[in-house]
Amino acid sequence: KVKQSSYHLAWLVELFVHSTDINDEVPIHRWKIFVDAHNGDILDKFDQVRTATVSGQVTGSVKDEPYGLAQTRPMPHVKIDVSGVGSTYTDEEGFYSIDIGNQSRNVTVKLEGAYLNTNNANGSDASITRSVDPGTTEDFSFGSLNSTSGERDTYYHANIIHDHAKSIHSGLTGADYVMPARVNIGSEDSYWPCNAYWDYTGINMFSEGGGCAGTDEM
């Protein structure tokens, strides 16, 4: 049976709502409400805000010197990989946002980004993988449980140097590529310890030894 259409004289009311409830996963709403012009009944309503994105910040525990105090700092230009969707990058303050559709996805974050890819020469590379839902905030933090201090320090400071150089002259493009950064290199390398070098492609940083602090933490 075909349902017959009916018409109502109605008011269209638009409401922009910003919730102050810290537990509200979607704090912003933009409602369209159709109100019967004769009796005030609500005929229909819908929220124009769509919760198809996931956003958050990537941070890491970083030092300014080998024996200094570590602080939580934003990780810039980190690549955010989303299964079945693609990738995006954090900004200079470590924030990201990406549309993931209407289903849960696996997100993988490494200390790899637009300008640097850190590789642990004597262990597993820093990596975090987590299932995320649309419309949620997902922060990722690199610390001692998922990375080495050399990976974190090298990634952070190399990116800071890159961005500082670009701020002086935007035409400096020689480092605008994903530079390999080998860290935690040990005695398997004949140049170890107390050393670091550039091999015309990437940087190589050594672990602690021989009375020297790790150059990947300097």
PLM features per residue range, with description:
Residues 93, 97, 142-179:
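Zn2+-dependent metallopeptidase catalytic core
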Residues 116-139:
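Structured interaction patches on ligand/partner-binding surfaces of diverse proteins
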Residues 1-74, 81-89, 173-202:
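Segments that shape or occlude catalytic/ligand-binding pockets
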Residues 75-82, 104, 135-137:
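Glycine-centered loop/turn motifs
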Residues 17, 111-115:
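Surface-exposed loop/turn motifs at beta-strand-loop junctions within extracellular Ig-like
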Residues 56, 84-111, 122-126, 140:
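Glycine-centered loop-to-beta-strand initiation motif
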Residues 205-218:
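Short pre-active-site segment immediately N-terminal to the catalytic Zn-binding motif
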Residues 5, 27, 146-157, 213-216:
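Extracytoplasmic/periplasmic, Sec-exported soluble proteins
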